Amino acid sequence: MKNSIFPDYCPNTPTHTFKIVDHLSVQVTETANPFSLPVSALFSMAARINKKRSFLFVSKVLGKHIPVDPYTPLLTGAALGLLLYRRQWERLKEVEAAQMQGSLYAAEAASGQEQAGGQAELAGQAGDAGNARNAGEASAEAPGPATDHIHPGVTLGEAEERLAEAARLLETAVRGLSQPEFAREAYTELAGAKLVLPEPVLFIGYAETATALGHSMFRLFHDGAAYIHTTREDIPELSSAISFEEEHSHAVDHLCYTLDPELLSGGEPVVLVDDEITTGNTVVNTIRDMQSKFPRSDYVVASILDWRTGANREAYAALEQELGIRIASLCLLEGSIEVSGTPLLEASAAPSAAHGAAGEATGSARRASAPVNLSLLQDGMDRLPVSSRDSLGEINAAPYIRGSGRFGIRSGDNEELDLAASAVAMRLQALREGGPALVLGTGEFMYLPMRIAAAMGEGVSYQSTTRSPIYPVDKPGYGVASAEAYPSAGDPGIINYLYNIAPDQYDDIFVLLEREVPIPRIQPMLDVLDKLAGRRVHVIMLGGGPGKEE
C-alpha cells in the first residue's frame, strides 16, 4: 500500500505517514471515512510536551489550538449532531418496522387460526376449534422483535422523512467542512432546520477542549435536548455530581456541576462528546461513575476522530455486558495509529511563561506594543453567584455565566443565549479597526466566544487559549509554528498557551473572559498580546456592569 508522506496528501490512499520531528513519526491508517473528508482538512500534527503521549492531532475544525473561521467548529459540532440525528431516527425506524412486522405476523396467525376454527366447527369439531382459537390468541400476544414502543405518536413514514432530511443536510455539512469558504452557508442552513430528536437526549462535553464541540452539537436541536460540560474549576459552593479522570491528559480531573437535579437523573440517552477518542478510557471512567449514580441503558460517544484499537473496543463491549448497557460510537474519521520513535525535544525551545516561545524567533520582542483597551461589558446574560478557588487557594467571587454550559442548559435556553451573543458581537464589531481580527476564547470558555466571533463580520478568526503544551517548529506542514506561554488570568498556578499567531497578523485581537479577574492577573497575557496585535488589543470581561473602557 502506498503511503502519503506529510505534508503531501493523496485522498485515494488510506494510510498516511507523518514525520513530525526528528526521531518521531506517526502512521495513520483510515478504517472508516464515510464522508471522504480529506485528512488534511481535519488535522495536522505536532510534537507534544507530555510524557503520556508525545504527539498531538492539531485540529483544523475545532477552534482550539490554532485560528480557524468560527463557522468551521460550529459546523463540526452540527455535523456530529446530524450523525446522531440520523442514528436515532434509524433506530426508531427499526423499532417501528419490527413492530409493524410483529403485528402483521400476529394478525396473519390469528386469521389463519380463525379460518381453521371455522372449518372445524362446520365439520362438527367444536372442541378442536376452541383449541385453535386459543392458539391464535397466544400468537397475537407474543411480542415480535424490538416491539417496545418508546416513541408514541411517531410513524414509520415520519422516520423516513427525517432520514431523508438528515441525508440532505449531511451533504451540506460535508461540503462546508471540505471547503471552508462554504462553512458559514452550511452552518446557517443546518441551524435553521430546527431539528428535533425522536426522544430527549443529554449531551456532556469534556473539558477543556470539547466544551464548544459538545455545545455546538447540542445547539443543533430545537427541542428536547440538554447540555452540560465537565470542568476543572473548583467551585466551593457546589458539589460535583460526577467525577472521573482523563488518564492521558496533562490535567486529569473532571468535575461536573449541575443546578438542575433532573438534568442527570433521567433515563434518556447520554451523548459523551470529545474531540478525539484514543483509548476510550475516559469514556469508561465516565460511564462507570454515571451508572453508579444516574443509571440508564444507552450511551453514545461522539468525536471528530476515533483511534481506538481492537482491545479498546473490546473494553467497551465488556463494559456493556458488565453494566447491561449499550454504547454506540459516532465520528467523522476512524482509524488506527502507529508511533515510531521518541522525540528528542530541547527544553529550551519549549514555550515557557518566562520567555514566550516565538519572541526571539519572530522578532515580536523588538516591535512596538499595541494599545490595550480593557472593557467591562454588560452582556445581558444571567449570572450564577458562586465563587472559584484557584490552585493557590485564592478565591474569586465574580459570578459565572449561568448559560455557558458548565452548570447545565436546555434547548429552551438557546434563544436567549443567541440573542445575547449577537448583541455582544455588534458591540465588538463596532470596535474593529477594519482589518483582520482574532477572537480568543479562554480555557473552557469556548462556545460563546466562538458564537460571538461568528457574528462579528468578515475577516474574523477564532481560537482559544489552552493548557496543552505543544512543541513549536516553524516548518511547512507542521501543526504549530509559534507558541506563547503565560500564567492563566484565572489561575496563575496554571500556564496557558497561544499558538500560531504571528505579529501583525491581526489588526485587532479580542480576548473574551467569562468573568471579572483582578487586573494584575491579566498583565502577563497582555505582555504577550500587545506584541502580536497590529493595532489594538481588546480585553473584554463579560458581565462586569455597564460597558466602559480604561
Residue ranges and their predicted role:
Residues M1-E550:
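PRPP-associated nucleotide enzymes
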